UniProtKB/Swiss-Prot annotation:
Cu cation A binds at H181, H199, H208. Residues 8-23 have a biased composition (Low complexity). This is Polyphenol oxidase B, chloroplastic. The lineage of its organism: Eukaryota, Viridiplantae, Streptophyta, Embryophyta, Tracheophyta. Its EC number is 1.10.3.1. PROSITE patterns: TYROSINASE_1, TYROSINASE_2. It comes from Solanum lycopersicum. One of its GO terms (cellular component) is chloroplast thylakoid lumen. It catalyses: 2 catechol + O2 = 2 1,2-benzoquinone + 2 H2O.
């Protein structure tokens, strides 16, 4: 089983595409999805000019030779999107064209997230070259560090915060570093008439890897320790499924007042959190977490684009994140941030700050610890084997970002240079990964659900709102397929034209071979197929409403094997709304066989 989230337009066409990957030895597996496309064209970029004190100048049009926006999308998206131009690799944005960022589901950010004034002509900024090293920096799990390390980490963050007071425009300062995420993620840069966004696509992993790389080196510079390494929040292991204690010490430089106070003091983390507390035991919650990790790292991500996310497409707002970005990356942000709609002591309304909103996430030191483990998952995923390897598509490899190094020198960086952490000078201290062997085996049901008692899909859809659990029967295009047929084609459970207001949290879970009596708080069951999730979005330039229109696909070949439904012509599907279901509509659902 593998999941794909895709944008749709008024008409959708399903297409088989191919993607080249870097050459690593592997054994083919049944669930493999490939994408490919050719593009090479220049186009104009319309950018807002704003200086660092927030004063906006007139709009400029900048000729960009390398502006991405990747190739087609996942399956139907490739042909459904009206392309404004052929896509080319995304360049590092011209920081002189930075505009005001917007709070997701809120007003403009009340300050400028743009970087300090450029010391030189942007076109002359060099590409970064790794400095020589004699020893790898080793990132360790945050729950296992000693007091000596905590003191050193506190000192580094404290000195970074001090720069905010003494040199507010110093790019090494704490707020300036946090603003990097705000600018790249909340609409400060306009490319091709659309906000540049490093989430929801294949840019997610490489952007954050480079971001942490320079952040880590800056911390080391501030305490004169070139071997200093960030910790990682080991939330994929039961021992790390809590807020790391060093971040929960009031008065320390690692503490953030704008966190959800309910997650303190050893509260078990919910890797599927979408704002509501799950009424279950700590043991069940940890079991759910390990199940989610297995689904997102193994079952749902047998091939690169499912893990990394879709290519970024020119002229279209890509909303096709990879598995780990959706869960657990997003839920950890939500879990740690303040509750949206609650009030701060000064009377301001929360938009999820700090961790729960991209513009402010970098203001919480735990953000970098969280993304340390997200980055570690990239390494762990490739280590599983099979088709799990880095993308070799040039539009990905040649995409660029911009950062200041620890000496305040500006550099451009490419995705192709961040594929090997050891070449970058760091590695991760090994920890057991119990989720790798946590494939759900117990079943929520005994035998096959009687599908004759369920309404057929064509009587349930179109669905106006998902305000309750919904079960239906759906026909398969073929049954009793041979192994060769499974290798050649993936069986895809496809939800066409899902619509919802993108200003709120959205999540619904999908189960096979259960009815509406399923206990949806127990995810460690073989019938759990996956989840559709969405965070509140920034209202993008050119949008006339807040309605998201997406397709959602789950590859179910492996799942049908696990629950013994390979020979059935009709199967039962159950949808369980977890967040925002009353605002979700779905046009239709079908099962397709798609070439791999």
């Amino acid at each position: 089983m593998a999941s794909v989230v895709c944008n749709s337009s008024s008409s959708t066409t399903t297409t088989t595409l191919k993607t080249p990957f870097t050459s690593l030895g592997s054994t083919p597996k049944p669930s493999q999805l490939f994408l490919h496309g050719k593009r090479n064209k220049t186009f104009k970029v319309s950018c807002k000019v704003i200086n660092n004190n927030g004063n906006q100048d007139e709009t400029n049009s900048v000729d960009r030779r390398n502006v991405l926006l990747g190739l087609g999308g996942l399956y139907g998206v490739a042909n459904a999107i009206p392309l404004a131009a052929s896509a080319t690799p995304i360049p590092s944005p011209d920081l002189k064209t930075c505009g005001r960022a917007t709070i997701s589901d809120g007003p403009l950010v009340p300050y400028s997230c743009c970087p300090p004034p450029m010391p030189t002509n942007f076109d002359t900024i060099p590409y970064y070259k790794f400095p020589s090293m004699t020893k790898l920096r080793i990132r360790t799990p945050a729950h296992a560090v000693d007091e000596e390390y905590i003191a050193k980490y506190n000192l580094a963050i404290s000195r970074m915060r001090d720069l905010d007071k003494t040199e507010p425009l110093n790019p090494l300062g704490f707020k300036q570093q946090a603003n990097i995420h705000c600018a790249y993620c909340n609409g400060a840069y306009i490319i091709g008439g659309k906000e540049l966004q490093v989430h929801n696509s294949w840019l997610f992993f490489p952007f954050h890897r480079w971001y942490l790389y320079f952040y880590e080196r800056i911390l080391g510079k501030l305490i004169d320790d070139p071997t200093f390494a960030l910790p990682y929040w080991n939330w994929d292991h039961p021992k790390g499924m809590r807020l790391p204690p060093m971040f929960d010490r009031e008065g320390s430089s690692l503490y953030d007042e704008r966190r959800n106070q309910q997650v303190r003091n050893g509260t078990v983390l919910d890797l599927g959190s979408f704002g509501d507390k799950v009424e279950t035991t700590q043991l069940q919650l940890m079991s759910n977490n390990l199940t989610l990790m297995y689904r997102q790292m193994v079952t749902n991500a047998p091939c690169p684009l499912l893990f990394f996310g879709a290519p970024y497409v020119l002229g279209n707002n890509v909303e096709a994140p990879g598995t780990i970005e959706t869960i657990p990356h997003i839920p950890v942000h939500i879990w740690a941030g303040t509750v949206r709609g609650s009030k701060f002591p000064n009377g301001d309304v929360s938009y999820g700050e700090d961790m729960g909103n991209f513009y402010s996430a970098g203001l919480d030191p735990v953000f970098y610890c969280h993304h340390g483990n997200v980055d570690r998952m990239w390494n762990e995923w490739k280590a599983i084997g099979g088709k799990r390897r880095d993308i070799s598509e040039k539009d990905w490899l040649n995409s660029e970002f911009f950062f200041y190094d620890e000496h305040k020198n500006p550099y451009r960086v490419k995705v192709r240079d961040c594929l090997d952490t050891k070449k970058m000078g760091y590695d991760y201290a090994p920890m057991p990964t119990p989720w790798r062997n946590f494939k759900p085996k117990s079943k929520a049901s005994v035998g096959k659900v009687n599908t004759s008692t369920l309404p057929p899909a064509n009587e349930v859809f179109p669905l106006a709102k998902m305000d309750k659990t919904i079960s239906f029967a759906i026909n398969r295009p073929a049954s009793s397929r041979t192994q060769q047929e499974k290798n050649e084609q993936e069986e895809m459970l496809t939800f066409n034209n899902i619509r919802y207001d993108n200003r709120g949290y959205i999540r619904f879970d999908v189960f096979l071979n259960v009815d509406n009596n399923v206990n949806a708080n127990e995810l460690d069951k073989a019938e759990f197929a996956g989840s559709y999730t969405s965070l509140p979005h920034v209202h993008r330039a050119g949008e006339n409403d807040h309605i998201a229109k997406v397709n959602f696909q789950l590859a179910i070949t492996e799942l049908l094997e696990d629950i013994g439904l390979e020979d059935e012509d009709t199967i039962a599907v159950t949808l369980v709304p977890k967040k925002g279901g009353e605002g979700i509509s779905i046009e239709n659902v079908e099962i397709k066989l798609v070439d791999c």
